[in-house]
Amino acid sequence: MAALVALHGVVRRPLLRGLLQEVRCLERSYASKPTLNEVVIVSAIRTPIGSFLGSLASQPATKLGTAAIQGAIEKAGIPKEEVKEVYMGNVIQGGEGQAPTRQATLGAGLPISTPCTTVNKVCASGMKAIMMASQSLMCGHQDVMVAGGMESMSNVPYVMSRGATPYGGVKLEDLIVKDGLTDVYNKIHMGNCAENTAKKMNISRQEQDTYALSSYTRSKEAWDAGKFASEITPITISVKGKPDVVVKEDEEYKRVDFSKVPKLKTVFQKENGTITAANASTLNDGAAALVLMTAEAAQRLNVKPLARIAAFADAAVDPIDFPLAPAYAVPKVLKYAGLKKEDIAMWEVNEAFSVVVLANIKMLEIDPQKVNIHGGAVSLGHPIGMSGARIVVHMAHALKPGEFGLASICNGGGGASALLIEKL
């Protein structure tokens, strides 16, 4: 080592110079342990959720994303120039044009120099965008970021295969089904996977219907009590020759007839099936965004955080068992955070299907009264690229100071993401 020290400043031969740099790097890595920055949520905003071909159908995902990003930055009270990078989840991108997150970001008036990335982890996309942004902030690559998710299922196109047009016409495929809702490994719909879970976990049609009705009831009560007011940014829609229409409330939860729910036919499995249009989530439009930053940046910008990112994790299982995947991600998060199930004040388990929540409550042995307390995707709607971010947004507002909330969401292919926050 003394000989190497003596060479400092006088080494000209490339081999020795490279060796010296390697030794310096080794010295530094052994001498110091890197510390991660604390990441906080400064604002958390979402658009209302529109029904399929409903109130927001005229707005592409990128426009909804623009509204969410703009709303989150305004709520944070920081200059747009402070946002160093943007990640947004978006699943079915066909027909949206290049780089959807870039479109949403520039539409929100952020500087042209802002890097943008679109994340696709199917239904977990919005949550994964938050996790990836948190990692960048923790490591010090950036100090202020926006992350969230967006989807307009009303605007997803039909496609046809390229090539010569065959005799007899062409077959159009619905990209909602092909790219969003089909298990490519077993070549079955997500709903058939959910039916498999219902059978495996012994969860009846009646249990699922009861849960679905509870979701609708909780959503209505939450809206009536103003539980969503602080997280919504209204969407103004221009209508030719008519006054502008302002959408400021979720559309889906009002569209239910409780008396018809038990009478509906099953959708995916005709004989001995359990899943219906009522106890599954719907196709929807919406976007959500959060302003994330390091605790140091929050201090520098003199902003008060809503919550801190405490831990997060992904998990994966057999693709057909995707509804059960959250039950494997959640224990990882609790372990990383050093917490027990009993420490969690509020759980969000995305309601892709009612059976998903019922199965995960059963596997995790958690209190149903603490799960999706203000309803979920069955009643509010499930814009697939948005939902993972939406449940984090809601927790950031619904928790009380000092409480922990844990959100989890399954995704096609057998995956899940889970994220823990602490309200500040």
UniProtKB/Swiss-Prot annotation:
The record marks 382 as: Increases nucleophilicity of active site Cys. Its EC number is 2.3.1.9. Signal peptide: none annotated. The modification N6-acetyllysine is found at residues 63, 171, 178, 187, 199, 220, 227, 242, 248, 254, 260, 270, 335. One of its GO terms (cellular component) is mitochondrial inner membrane. One of its GO terms (biological process) is response to starvation. It is found in: Mitochondrion. It catalyses: 2 acetyl-CoA = acetoacetyl-CoA + CoA; propanoyl-CoA + acetyl-CoA = 2-methyl-3-oxobutanoyl-CoA + CoA. Pathway: Lipid metabolism; fatty acid beta-oxidation. The modification N6-succinyllysine is found at residues 63, 75, 171, 178, 187, 199, 220, 227, 240, 242, 260, 263, 265. Belongs to the thiolase-like superfamily. Thiolase family. This is Acetyl-CoA acetyltransferase, mitochondrial. It comes from Mus musculus (Mouse).
